[in-house]
Amino acid sequence: MTSPESADVPFLLRPAQPADLPVLERFAAASAYGITTLPPDSAVLAERLQRSASAFATEDAASGEEIYLFVVEDVASGAVVGTSGIAASAGFADRFYCYRNEYVVHASPPLGASNRTHTLHLCHDLTGVTLLTSFYVEPAYERTLAPQLLSRGRLLFIAQFAERFSDRIGAESPGLADDSGRCPFWDAVGRRYFDMDYPSVERLAVGRSRSFIADLMPPSPIYVPLLPEEAQWSIGQLHPVGELPFSILVDEGMDPDTYVDIFDGGPTAHARVAQLKTVAASREIVVAGIAESASHRARGWQLAASARRADFRAVLLPGHARGRSLELGAQAARLLGVQVGDTLRLAPAPVATQATAGDRHD
C-alpha cells in the first residue's frame, strides 16, 4: 500500500453546473476566434450547460449526442479558472467535415519529370469520433498544473466510462486569425464560395450541422501551391492560444498532421483512445485508508479520478502510487468525495512543462 500523499492538492476538476454560466461567459468573451464550442452567446452556453448536466446525470444508455463540460477550481481560493469539454460523437446528427492532407504525384516518364504536390481533400473521415472541446484556462494559470488537469483529467473520464464514447478521438485547434478576425486560410479558400468573413462563418457554425459546407464547397481537391503564400503557410499552424492544449494532446500521442479545419486550416489531431498515454497507463485502485496529514512531500504527480459519473471528480496528487491500494490524505479524499473501500482511477501525470502547483505567472 502506498503511503498518504502531501496535503497540497492544488486543483479540482468537476462537472460544470448551470451556476457556472457567468464564469463561462467570461471565458467565452476572452477566447479566440475558432473555438465554436465556447461561443460568446449566453443562451447557447446556458443550453450547453443544461445538456452537460443531463449527460452526467442520466442513467440511459449513451446515444452519442451527449456533451460533457468540466471546470477546474483553484482549491485555495475556490475560483473557477478554466474549462474543457467532451463531445461524445462528432457530427452526431450529420457528417463532420475537415480537410485531409495528401500528396499527389504527377509524372512524365518520357520527359523524366515528376512533381509531388500538396493537396487538401474535403472528407468526413472523423465522423463519429469523440471530440475534445472547449479548452480555456485563465492566462494567470497557464504555467500551473491546471491545464494538465483540464486536458488529461477528462481522459480519465473517457477511460472510466468507455462505453459512452468512440474508440477514436479527435481535437480541433484554432488556426491563424488576427484580433479583427482576418484568417488567411479562410480568405483564400472558403470566402470564395461563402461570401462572408471568417467571424461570420464561425458564428454561423455554432450549434449547426456542417453539411452546408458540402453543399457549397467544391468536392475536388485543393492544390495548395495555387493558394496565396500566406494561406499556404497557415495550413496546420496554430493560433497562439491553442499552443498549450495542443502540446498536451501531442504529448498524449495524438497525430496532428493528417487533418486540418475546414474554416481556419488549424490542425485537427486524432488518435485511438486506447493509445493515449493517460488512458493506456490508467488503472483502478482501492482507497485503503484516509490520513489526516501526509508524512512527506512526494516527487512527481499522478492523476486521480472518482469512479462515479454524476459527481465525477479528478485531482492531481503528488507522488506515484504502487500496488493496488492507496492511502489518501484527508483533503484529497474530501475533494474526490471518496471513502475507504471506494475505487479510484489513477494515471501518471507526465507534466512536460515547468509548471508547479504554486506558479501564477502570465
Task: Give the positions of each predicted feature.
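A generic structural signal for residues embedded in beta-strands
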Residues: 344-346
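Extended, composition-driven regions rather than compact fold-specific motifs
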Residues: 65-71, 80-81, 86, 91-95, ...
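A short beta-loop-alpha structural element at the N-terminal edge
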Residues: 12-24, 37
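Short, Lys/Arg- and Gly-enriched loop/turn segments at beta-strand edges
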Residues: 351-361
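Conserved acetyl-CoA-binding loop-helix of GNAT-fold acetyltransferases
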Residues: 119, 137, 142-158
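Active-site rim helix/loop that mediates acceptor-substrate recognition in acyltransferases
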Residues: 37-81, 85-98
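Short beta-strand-centered segments at strand-helix junctions
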Residues: 316-341
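Conserved acyl-donor/pantetheine-binding loop and adjacent beta-alpha core of acyl/acetyltransferases
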Residues: 88-134, 199-207
